Swiss-Prot record:
It comes from Mycobacterium sp. (strain KMS). The keyword Transferase applies. GO terms for cellular component: cytoplasm. Inhibited by UTP. GO terms for biological process: 'de novo' CTP biosynthetic process; UDP biosynthetic process. Keywords: ATP-binding, Cytoplasm, Kinase, Nucleotide-binding, Pyrimidine biosynthesis, Transferase. This is Uridylate kinase.
Length: 252
């Protein structure tokens, strides 16, 4: 049942709390990587890389899925007349560009990073092999999953849910440019409330604009929690991993 303004974490300061999770899947929206424009905003990518590096140094295993919305959005291109399958593949290539950019910034932070793609691109990334991804994580490396599922009609939100389940992550950390899940769009409804806890079923039934229903159904069916939080607040990834009271926790 949804709970406006209730605690779901310890609330201690970052650095004082032992991480609540040992392996997480971080889902990043591609639009944020562009800073609201087409292309990459190096300042945003650096902010994200620095936050991930902080978490990895604390001993948490981090895998990442990135969208490609700062380059292409298949559904929107389809609305303008482009064939959906082709436009989806273009979007997958955009996610690989974002993945390589994040890899570069993470390695500048001293974090060993591997990119695995669902479409074979041997010169720039490894193929997606779940057991190899787990081995990388166990060695303290960040693994970034690019090219979505490698299939049209599947979003990167669904990719994040599937990859999280396959690598044995304990939670999907869904990073947004808003503080969490609201009862309505806060930009349109001044009475919209931030929900600190809600179930997967409620999100789906109420049509709350968080992620696509396929991703939430997959997480609901397999008991995978999702934490929706604001990525653009510095230190929020570490707070999320520590179980602090931020964002919205979605559980079964």
């Amino acid at each position: 049942m949804s709970e406006p303004n209730s605690d779901h974490g310890a609330g201690a300061a970052v650095g004082e709390t032992r991480p609540l999770y040992s392996r997480v899947l971080l889902k990043l929206g591609g639009e944020m990587f562009g800073g609201g424009a087409v292309g990459l905003d190096p300042d945003v990518v650096h902010l994200v890389a620095r936050q991930i590096a902080e978490v990895v140094r604390s001993g948490v295993q981090v895998a990442v899925v990135i969208g490609g919305g700062n380059f292409f959005r298949g559904a929107q291109l389809q609305q303008r007349g482009m064939e959906r399958t082709r436009s989806d593949y273009m979007g997958m290539l955009g996610t690989v560009m974002n993945s390589l950019a994040l890899q570069d910034f993470l390695e500048k932070e001293g974090i060993d990073t591997r990119v695995q793609t669902a479409i074979t691109m041997g010169q720039v990334a490894e193929p997606y092999i779940p057991l190899r991804a787990v081995r990388h994580l166990e060695k303290g490396r960040v693994v970034i999953f690019g090219a979505g599922m490698g299939l049209p009609y599947f979003s990167t939100d669904t990719t994040a849910a599937q990859r999280a389940l396959e690598i044995g992550a304990e939670v999907v950390l869904m990073a947004k440019a808003v503080d969490g899940v609201y009862t309505a769009d806060p930009r349109k409804d001044p009475d919209a409330q931030l929900l600190t806890a809600i179930t997967h079923r409620e999100v789906i039934d109420r049509g709350l604009a968080v992620a696509d229903a396929t991703a939430f159904s997959l997480c609901m069916d397999n008991g995978m929690p999702i934490l929706v939080f604001n990525l653009l607040v510095d230190g929020n990834i570490a707070r999320a991993v520590a179980g602090e009271k931020i964002g919205t926790l979605v559980t079964t």
